[in-house]
Amino acid sequence: MAFGRNNRVRFRDWISEGTEYGYGRNKARPSLNTVLKNVRRGLKKPLSFGSHNKKRDSNSSTTTQKNIINPQGSFLQNWNKIFLFASVIALAIDPLFFYIPIVDGERHCLNLHRNLEIAASVLRTFIDAFYIIHIVFQFRTAYISPSSRVFGRGELVDDPKAIAIKYLSSYFIIDLLSILPLPQLVVLAVIPNVNKPVSLITKDYLITVIFTQYIPRILRIYPLYTEVTRTSGIVTETAWAGAAWNLSLYMLASHVFGALWYLISVEREDRCWREACEKIPEVCNFRFLYCDGNSSVRNDFLTTSCPFINPDDITNSTVFNFGIFTDALKSGIVESDDFWKKFFYCFWWGLRNLSALGQNLNTSKFVGEIIFAVSICISGLVLFALLIGNMQKYLESTTVREEEMRVRKRDAEQWMSHRMLPDDLRKRIRRYEQYKWQETRGVEEENLLRNLPKDLRRDIKRHFCLDLLKKVPLFEIMDEQLLDAVCDKLKPVLYTENSYAIREGDPVEEMLFVMRGKLMSATTNGGRTGFFNAVYLKPSDFCGEDLLTWALDPQSSSHFPISTRTVQALTEVEAFALAADDLKLVASQFRRLHSKQLQHTFRFYSVQWRTWGASFIQAAWRRHCRRKLARSLTEEEDRFRNAITKRERNAASSSSLVATLYASRFASNALRNLRTNNLPLLPPKPSEPDFSLRNP
């Protein structure tokens, strides 16, 4: 395979690095320092390339080729999946900042949730670490040259400078905007160092900062999802995981709209307070609306200036209309310090209105509120359609085989009814279809293997059949090359209980190797009366060896040999079949093994040779018994004759003479019958397999 050395790039496997990250089953989640340390360690490992790359000087080639990652390798594919899930989690963490502003119900002012500030900032920083690692990988990931995609997988570009230029001109700006720690800066750095009311700055800045990064993060997910599905074909391994993945995206949108609904509810109450404060400027200051200000009169007018009235119940146009945010204010969810209570209530509101496409939303005349309701309606329509379509696709993939089985059974029933088959044949057909479904689950193994490369198909067949073939003594003494040739030609077959694999007198078209089940091989020696021989075949046994003798004979005719035995399945049987044409192709290789050992092995384990040998021994034993009986009868006859002669000389009584005559006649008749009876016919001697080196 020397041609593979000049036109391929060879990368070292990154599986060991994957295990170092600790994503194994029994390992705890690694810390950020551990992840970064393992990433640096993995990037320092050398990777070997083929000789087709551009020539560089000795110093540059040793430094630049060490840190390049194969874009089609298993390490990067696994990392892209991890980063995809991390990106989705990041989209779920950013809306948590919207829950930081709260309304102090006792003092009627805006305040901040300090514990939530810290928790959201820590979670956001942890997720940003994945973005940092991803950016580092992007600067060290080779790419396929677009001009080389005419044929095959294309040529990998491993030049670090070219890789950096390509990444800087594509997604680097989006990744940079996504990784900027703007929410953390606003919460932990900007707010403590300003003179304006803290809650006012937080409320105004959070929406701007979050959406500045939220849009780039959403834009980055789609090409990442496309890359994962393009390289590995799927995101999740099972259909249920795929359905859960699509459902999680729908729930993520519900979480985002619920958090926005909460923040805008706080903003609308703040707007109502501002309008009420503008009406009495002599006693009210905007700083009174925030809990870091000082005033003793704010509770007097804020309690009655902004009543929470449903939009349908408003009769006075001067009353502030909270629209779709009335529920959040009346329920007191904006005044609660319990984060989980707020989170689940707002999440339920978002999920309910997304599912209802916003049909129950009664908005006010506020333009921002109307736009928010329209976005809920459109997003719900799009997401619900995608959710139903994708979940239907994933869930149908789990039942597609069952549906195909039902259709096949229905077609079979209609066909059997149309052809008016008898009940026994119908039962056999149903039993075979049921057994085939239980064994294969509707997977067409032959079609699946046929579409695989030859070497991979050979290895799979070796995995299936090699151990079984080695249990057959005939194949145990063969070399690996011959076993590979036999394995490649084997095809799986199924037999139901009481079905016939081979019938006596029919042409033998295949040789069977039993993998599971029990069969009976019987012969009547061509239907001769009184002859019956049966043996039982168990796993690792074989039958149809007439075909092997026929295939090994260079002078054999084109007609298949006639079977001398009937093979019937006593239980459900799984076996591998070697067809006559395939066996003929392999037979030329068998003739190289012209050893006596192979010939004796074939004779010893062949059912036909065993039957013939047993019959031959029985016939020899019968001949021995007949000869022994003939000798004894001859001796008895001679003894009787001597007795007759002796009695005649002694003039014995007539009665004794008559008895002696009768005994003599009986011995003579028995001997005559013994000589006239023929031995039972022997089964025909099986043909000798030709293991010579003659060419056919």
UniProtKB/Swiss-Prot annotation:
Superkingdom to which the source organism belongs: Eukaryota
Membrane-protein topology: Multi-pass membrane protein
Binding sites annotated in the UniProt record for a nucleoside 3',5'-cyclic phosphate: 474-598
Comment, domains: The binding of calmodulin to the C-terminus might interfere with cyclic nucleotide binding and thus channel activation.
Family: Belongs to the cyclic nucleotide-gated cation channel (TC 1.A.1.5) family.
Role noted for this protein: Putative cyclic nucleotide-gated ion channel.
Protein's recorded name: Putative cyclic nucleotide-gated ion channel 13
Species this protein is from: Arabidopsis thaliana
Gene: CNGC13
